[in-house]
């Protein structure tokens, strides 16, 4: 026992252990007890705790943790993951802006609203205007945390500029010593300047790839320049304020500096603002109003010479960063204007402004607003331009004007002689293709979307007439054509048609039973595919005969209507599914679709051919519902596309900056679909293309934004009347031909309902928050009811109100809207 105590009682003892038995008897291990330190010494060993809580967390650097931080920043315990229904409810509430923890985003929405209102709807109130000119109060800035604001400095986010030489510029020529990283607040000083560390060696340069040098050489040869000048141009014209990552200097720092400037966490990166495009433009007059005594201040209190700062020079001696960016690039990078909520492009045109008295809560919401990138606007404009150019190059341009274009030509018709024929075509003042080509491309056209009663009656009458037709054979055996008896010359031709029991037929042989009518160049007795035999005997009704794909190999069958040379076949003419049996020349002159393999109009489906795109699942039932949204990407011509591009690059782009691409794209597409759906109901036989309903839906968004920012504007009634005057003017323009006012009206209604639900909203208190939730629910329910009623009217209860034509084409003169649509009244 004494030996055990001597060797240390704190050592583990295991009975029967071989290691313990082999221990030398004279070996003794003495472990001194831990010395108790004085409270003053213990506190002095800890790192000094900053009084400012902004130093507890750094965006750019990571501080070494002390004992005083371990208790405050403990790892959170495990929590149960939220259920799917809770996640859906939370995401939905955040989307509509009615969640309880959405205060931060609501402030962003409010700031965007003020920016937009100041541009679109006139002057703001004085308090709001002053608040917009002040910096953000919620986010700590460089001037507020490190030094008083000496001058107006551009903010440049440069997360890679975090070297030791910048943090400790006084130690450039002295031995390096370990320092804890000090990064003030949310944004470090290095984020506002572009200074690289490292003074020991030159920067590394990235080698030029072979492909890049090849492209440079090819471009030089095309321009007639020397290849050596093109390859050396890169080295001579490297003028940039920020070097690429491969050009960065290596920091001669120790392990601590390498650790604290390695990577950024997800939370830190999300908190860094994108201030590259939010700063004012850099110019020579930028520091003109700054006194000579005022200069930027570094983190250690060292004044930076203004000349060196404005010139883009490094802080330390011997450092070079290159030259400044070109003036155009700087203007593009630093002079991006924010979009004020309630003020935008239209408000800037109409000289709107905020009112003078606005609460501090609303001011904070307006202050934190930022602008989105208009990705949807750029994508939509690119698609519109490309599709319009392809359509023009493929289908050409129709006659330009507002009237009807008449073309007369001598064409070979059914009787075998040339006749003077007129082709009437509606002129297109948009400088684009004809209406027939637009329908074939996917324009809004009701007969291609659902079954139309008038067109069905037209097809039924044509088939009744075809049952009484026969084969008109020329007496000189020059040819034959399927026609009526009244159209067949009694002196120059023979009309071949058997009645019920007349004609050569064998009553005993049912397979050789003579049909009740005759079709030129088709007979069930000579057709081998499909053959008329057994259970597949062709009926007496010729309108139910199939297309014969294979005839019997015989030069002379003895049948007059088979041995003749056929001159006319079915041709689909017009946009209503009308069919005529005529010559190929006449069909091409009338811009129809000639069917070479068919002999009867009942064997072809003209409406399926006229509509184009994907074939109908059932040739008798149109089902191209996708025309409702496909027509949003088509235009009637070059001028139409230019008008859409101007509208999108002003109104749509401005609204997308405010609300983001996802919200604006939903409003744009749904309002356009609703407008086209209503136009298909009330104007079924008119081919319409273009985003007319979508554009008026965006105009409705301006009204909704005006209503939501009513308390912020100095003169809201003036802004309302100005917007109303613009919409009224556009509605009057819709009374002209080729402009769809029905799509405008319903697109405006649907856009207003969707804007109340999806656009950002500024809350003016708790009651206003609950009012917003009720407004979202009511708006979505009303829109769903409107859309469902339009679908029912289109498919189940079709309506035909001729008087509604005056809303989209008012007859200012007797011939202004006459025959605007060819064959509008079907006979």
Swiss-Prot record:
Gene3D superfamilies xrefs: Rhomboid-like (1.20.1540.10)
Positions of transmembrane segments: 382-402, 628-648, 664-684, 687-707, 719-739, 745-765, 774-794
Report if keyword Acetylation is assigned.
Answer: no
Q: Does the keyword Protein transport apply?
A: yes
Chain ranges on the Lumenal side, renumbered to this chain: 403-627, 685-686, 740-744, 795-827
Please give, as recorded in its UniProt entry, the membrane topology of this protein: Multi-pass membrane protein
- What UniProt keywords are attached to this protein's entry? Endoplasmic reticulum, Membrane, Phosphoprotein, Protein transport, Transmembrane, Transmembrane helix, Transport
InterPro entries assigned: Inactive_Rhomboid, iRhom1_2_N, Peptidase_S54_rhomboid_dom, Rhomboid-like_sf
Question: SUPFAM superfamilies given for it?
Answer: Rhomboid-like
What residue ranges lie in the Cytoplasmic compartment?
1-381, 649-663, 708-718, 766-773
Phosphoserine modification, residue list: 60, 83, 87, 293, 295, 298
Compositional bias ranges of the Polar residues kind:
1-19
Q: Which Pfam families match?
A: iRhom1-2_N (PF12595), Rhomboid (PF01694)
Q: Where in the cell is it found?
A: Endoplasmic reticulum membrane
Q: Which Gene Ontology CC terms are recorded?
A: endoplasmic reticulum; endoplasmic reticulum membrane; plasma membrane
Which Gene Ontology BP terms does the record give? negative regulation of protein secretion; protein localization to plasma membrane; protein transport
- Specify residue ranges for compositional bias: Basic and acidic residues: 64-76
- The segment annotated Disordered runs over 1-86
Quote the subunit structure annotation.
Interacts with EGF. Interacts (via cytoplasmic N-terminus) with FRMD8/iTAP; this interaction leads to mutual protein stabilization. Interacts with ADAM17/TACE.
Give the family, as the similarity comment puts it. Belongs to the peptidase S54 family.
Functional description taken from the UniProt entry: Regulates ADAM17 protease, a sheddase of the epidermal growth factor (EGF) receptor ligands and TNF, thereby plays a role in sleep, cell survival, proliferation, migration and inflammation. Does not exhibit any protease activity on its own.
The protein here is known as: Inactive rhomboid protein 2
- What organism is this sequence from? Mus musculus (Mouse)
């Amino acid at each position: 026992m004494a030996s055990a105590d001597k060797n240390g009682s704190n050592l583990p003892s295991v009975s029967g252990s071989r290691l313990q038995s082999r221990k030398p008897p004279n070996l003794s291990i003495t472990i001194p007890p831990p010395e108790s330190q004085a409270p003053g010494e213990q506190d002095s060993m800890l790192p000094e705790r900053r009084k400012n809580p902004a130093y507890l967390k750094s965006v750019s650097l990571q501080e070494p943790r002390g004992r005083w931080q371990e208790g405050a920043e403990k790892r959170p315990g495990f929590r149960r993951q939220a259920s799917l229904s809770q996640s859906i409810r939370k995401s939905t509430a955040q989307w509509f802006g009615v969640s309880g923890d959405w205060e931060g985003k609501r402030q962003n929405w409010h700031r965007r609203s003020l920016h937009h209102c100041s541009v679109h709807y006139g002057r703001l109130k004085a308090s709001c205007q002053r608040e917009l000119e002040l910096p953000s109060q919620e986010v700590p800035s460089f001037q507020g945390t490190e030094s008083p604001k000496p001058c107006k400095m551009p903010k440049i986010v440069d997360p890679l500029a975090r070297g030791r030489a910048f943090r400790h510029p006084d130690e450039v020529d002295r031995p390096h010593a370990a320092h804890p990283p000090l990064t003030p607040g949310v944004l470090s000083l290095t984020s506002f300047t572009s200074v690289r560390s490292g003074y020991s060696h030159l920067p590394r340069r990235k080698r030029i790839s072979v492909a890049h040098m090849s492209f440079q050489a090819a471009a030089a040869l095309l321009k007639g320049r020397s290849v050596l000048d093109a390859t050396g141009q890169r080295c001579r014209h490297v003028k940039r304020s920020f070097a690429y990552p491969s050009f960065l200097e290596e920091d001669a720092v120790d392990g601590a500096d390498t650790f604290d400037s390695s990577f950024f966490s997800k939370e830190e990166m999300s908190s860094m603002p994108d201030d590259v495009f939010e700063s004012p433009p850099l110019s020579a007059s930028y520091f003109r109003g700054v006194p000579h005594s005022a200069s930027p201040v570094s983190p250690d209190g060292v004044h930076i010479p203004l000349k060196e700062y404005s010139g883009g020079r490094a802080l330390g001696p011997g450092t070079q960063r290159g030259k400044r960016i070109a003036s155009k690039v700087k203007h593009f990078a630093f002079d991006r204007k924010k979009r004020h909520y309630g003020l935008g492009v239209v408000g800037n045109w109409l000289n709107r402004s905020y009112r003078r008295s606005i609460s501090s809560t609303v001011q904070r919401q307006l202050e934190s607003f930022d602008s989105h990138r208009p990705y949807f606007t750029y994508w939509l404009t690119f698609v519109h331009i490309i599709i319009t150019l392809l359509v023009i190059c493929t289908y050409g341009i129709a006659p330009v004007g507002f009237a009807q274009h008449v073309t007369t030509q001598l064409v070979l018709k059914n009787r075998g002689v040339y006749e003077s024929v007129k082709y009437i075509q509606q002129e297109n003042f948009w400088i684009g293709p004809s209406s027939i080509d637009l329908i074939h491309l996917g324009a809004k056209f009701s007969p291609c979307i659902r079954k139309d009663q008038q067109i069905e009656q037209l097809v039924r009458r044509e088939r009744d007439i075809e049952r009484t037709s026969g084969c008109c054979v020329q007496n000189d055996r020059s040819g034959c054509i399927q026609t009526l008896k009244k159209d067949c010359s009694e002196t120059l031709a023979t009309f071949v048609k058997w009645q019920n029991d007349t004609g050569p037929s064998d009553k005993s042989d049912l397979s050789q039973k003579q049909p009740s009518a005759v079709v030129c160049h088709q007979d069930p007795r000579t057709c081998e595919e499909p053959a008329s035999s057994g259970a597949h005997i062709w009926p007496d009704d010729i309108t139910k005969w199939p297309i014969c794909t294979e005839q019997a190999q015989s030069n002379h069958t003895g049948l007059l209507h088979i041995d003749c040379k056929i001159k006319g076949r079915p041709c689909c003419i017009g946009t209503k599914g009308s069919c005529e049996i005529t010559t190929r020349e006449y069909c091409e002159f009338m811009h129809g679709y000639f069917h070479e393999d068919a002999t009867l109009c009942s064997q072809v489906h003209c409406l399926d051919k006229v509509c184009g795109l994907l074939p109908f699942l059932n040739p008798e039932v149109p089902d191209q519902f996708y025309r409702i949204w496909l027509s949003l990407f088509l235009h009637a011509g070059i001028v139409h596309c230019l008008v859409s591009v101007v509208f999108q690059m002003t109104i749509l782009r401005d609204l997308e900056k405010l609300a983001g691409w996802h919200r604006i794209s939903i409003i744009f597409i749904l309002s356009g679909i609703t407008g086209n759906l209503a136009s298909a109901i009330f104007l079924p036989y008119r081919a319409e293309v273009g985003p007319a309903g979508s554009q008026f839906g965006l105009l409705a968004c301006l009204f909704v934004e005006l209503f939501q920012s009513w308390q912020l504007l100095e003169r809201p009634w003036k802004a309302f009347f100005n917007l109303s005057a613009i919409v009224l003017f556009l509605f009057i323009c819709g009374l002209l031909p080729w402009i769809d006012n029905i799509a405008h009206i319903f697109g405006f209604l649907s856009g207003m309902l969707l804007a109340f639900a999806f656009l950002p909203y500024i809350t003016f208190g708790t009651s206003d928050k609950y009012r917003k939730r009720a407004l979202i629910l009511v708006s979505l329910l009303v829109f769903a009811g409107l859309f469902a009623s339009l679908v029912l009217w289109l498919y189940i209860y079709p309506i035909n109100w001729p008087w509604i034509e005056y809303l989209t084409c008012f007859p200012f003169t007797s011939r202004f809207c006459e025959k605007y649509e060819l064959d509008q009244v079907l006979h």
